[in-house]
Amino acid sequence: MSAMSAMGKPEHGSATTSDLEHRATESSLEKQDVEAAPPGPVKPVDPSPKQSTLKTTLLLASVFLAMFLVAVDRTIISTAIPSITNDYNSLNDVGWYGSIYLLTCCAFQLLFGKLYAMYSARVVLLVSLVIFLAASALCGAAPNSEAFIVGRAISGVGSAGIFAGNIVAIVHTIPLAKRPKIQGLMGAVMGLATIIGPLIGGAFTTRVTWRWCFYINLPFGGLALVAIFFYFKVPNRSPAADLSLKQKILSLDIPGTILLVPAIVCLLLALQWGGQVYDWNNKYIIVLLTLMAVLFVAFIAVQICLPKTATVPPRLLMHRSVVAGFLTTIAIGSAQYIFVYYIPIWFQTVRGVNAVDSGIQLLPLMISFVVASIVGGLLNQRIGYYTALGIFGSSVMAVGAGLMTTWNLEISQGKVIGYQILFGFGMGLAFQTPNLAVQTVLPRPEVPMGIALMFFGQLLSAAIFVAVGQNILANQLLSRLAGIDGFEHLKSLILSGGVTAVIDAVPEESKHRVLVAYSDALQQVFIVGLAMSCVGVVGTSCMEWKNILKKPAPPAGPPAGAPTESAPVETKAAGHT
């Protein structure tokens, strides 16, 4: 690695901000991983601070609890929205309640990766939790729709930090060989949260008030906050400890962030509005997409021209497994959201069940995902080669997706359940593969940025492909129902997002045609999920075959006689920051 040789050279004159930041990042964190030793074979030091099993268990419990709260927060609102709109008389704001959270979470994900790489992971995670809890309190107490939307936006920012921070906490605490089981459990926690989120929201809304969907985060989030404060051990000196305040600010890639955040905002707004609020050829959509493209190109240029302070350093993309992992994350995330979002719509339209029952019909997919996440973690910890399980899991996932594209009006319930189980089980086996690849192939200082890149891909793909699916569904319905009596009225219902309203609006003799149109249109949506599942197979197949059970080779020392920087190396568990 070029950075290692650069560390052996003495510095002359005043260093630039980027040089200081680069040296601080690499030298400070690399000293955490390997003990100073004479030339020759060196045994790497376990990068995880030593602490009691009880303290580690409490920390992991708090990390899982924080992740559970964030995952539930994404879905708990779905069953509460009718009551929220009734209280605020804000039917026109419904779209913002969910999208603003996803927008800010996605937009700030990469920035938090940079923060975790440069500053104390413990402090950044605690601040993220505080932001999330404060936003939850604001949402619960919001006097009007505008305040509620602001609270959801801030909640998304805190969630972005918690998503990446929980994995970073595991990296700092658990040895690499033992992480697959822990991350498998984390995947199971996220899957469980997705299942019960709407149920919890419905229970609070019906029995108490929808505001408790957000107040409930405060006591449990407070417990996680206290446990992380006391039990999350990180090195005393952060990579940015030697930088001045000005240098710390400059190291955060302010130009890149200023370009990236509005680019994502433009993209998600265009996807939210395109084909529904405005036609795709409307001037507002064209301006948003054009501005998005310009900002993204400018962001890439900044990352290339200023690599030492880049939010996504180009050196990350020099690792084959990182690029393959990013592709896999996008593929799995988009396929997951396509099916999780549109399977309930299939049940509500083709099978005629209500919203609650359609969620129950999704349980085979989600339960198999939870089980496979746990099984995958155990197998990865036993086998060591995560790529093998990733290829197998993504292949099973693709087969399940392909079978679900055959759903029609006559398909049996047994096949509906079986195909979901196949898809969910394959997805669960492959779900953690990108994160394990990043942790294995990247130097430890760059792991937070790599993890943030994976979460960014997952969130961005979810936002994009749910919107893509909605546009495919609407366009397919319009083309298949053209010529039916009352088409203009049906067209307005389709474009306004009405699902069962379209079926209820047609006379009895036309219902079968509408059901067939829905079934065929949703097949086309599922084909998109199949295509992305196949991309996941390509992504996992391109990953390097690394064994997490083998200890990494120590970094090469400087050539004999070369000047070196001397610095004390900590060999004890570091204290709090």
UniProtKB/Swiss-Prot annotation:
Spans traversing the lipid bilayer: 52-72, 93-113, 123-143, 157-177, 184-204, 212-232, 249-269, 285-305, 326-346, 359-379, 383-403, 416-436, 449-469, 525-545
Keyword field: Membrane, Transmembrane, Transmembrane helix, Transport
Biased composition (Basic and acidic residues): 19-34
Coiled coil: none
Subcellular localization: Membrane
Top-level taxon: Eukaryota
Gene Ontology MF: a single term: transmembrane transporter activity
Membrane topology: Multi-pass membrane protein
Positions with biased composition (Pro residues): 38-47
Predominant location: membrane
InterPro entries to which the protein is assigned, alphabetical: MFS, MFS_dom, MFS_trans_sf
Residue ranges of the region described as Disordered: 1-49, 554-577
Entry's Gene Ontology cellular component terms: plasma membrane
Purpose: MFS-type transporter; part of the ergochrome gene cluster responsible for the typical purple-black color of the ergot sclerotia. The ergochrome gene cluster produces several ergot pigments including the yellow ergochrome secalonic acid and its derivatives, as well as the red anthraquinones endocrocin and clavorubin.
Family: Belongs to the major facilitator superfamily. TCR/Tet family.
UniProt protein name: MFS-type transporter CPUR_05422
